[in-house]
Amino acid sequence: EGVIRSDSDELEGRFPTDGYANLSTSCLCCGGLRFAAKLAASLGDNDTAALYNSRAEALGEAIERYFGATLHGFETYRYSKGFDTLRAWICLPLCMGLTNRAGGTLDAMLSPYLWTEEGMRTCEKSAENTSDTIWDRSTLYGFKCAFLSGAGDRIMQPFLDYCHKRLVCDRVPYAVEAYPEGEKRHLSGESALFVRVVTEGLFGIRP
């Protein structure tokens, strides 16, 4: 069907999928192809750049066909077939330049289904998920996608609130892995992603 087959993602099975394909893996692959194309072009290898861009385009279309869905009235994406709950990773298509469902996705992200004072829930609370677990990784991708989509006016205050909590409040001065899981352990990967929110999201400086 054109998407990437994957039985899990970086959440390592903490939240359910169909074990066949998920939105995160396909979006990360799409983004990787786009950046690989830019690298090839910068090295003068235009044939390889064209090949990777073509593959990224085809994968983007497959993501739209396979994962595109209307959930709670929002035109956004399902995470995996058979799981019609909102997930934080709906922000990834926007980060990878897939903007067909930008408006509905931003509305869903900032809705009470996902947004909390700590960031985005990994999954909306439902029979499928009863936890309020947030991962800074997906929250930071959410900030980045909102800025890249021109929705800075909507996301700036939540971003400033997040900066206050993480940089000058109870757990400083880094982004955290997850909460309540892990009791807000610090991870370098999330902190590096925070920097990318500023350089790529706010300033538009992209590789």
Where would I find each of the regions flagged by the language model?
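Extended glycan-interaction surfaces of carbohydrate-active proteins
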Residues: 1-21, 58-136, 160-177
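Aromatic- and histidine-enriched alpha-helix N-cap/loop-to-helix transition segments
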Residues: 20-31, 84-88, 133-141, 147-150, ...
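Active-site neighborhood of glycoside hydrolase catalytic domains
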Residues: 23-71
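Well-ordered alpha-helical scaffold segments within catalytic/enzyme domains
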Residues: 28-46, 91-102, 140-151, 197-206
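Solenoid-repeat scaffolds in large eukaryotic assemblies
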Residues: 49, 56, 102-106, 152-156
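Non-catalytic C-terminal accessory modules of carbohydrate-active enzymes
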Residues: 148-207
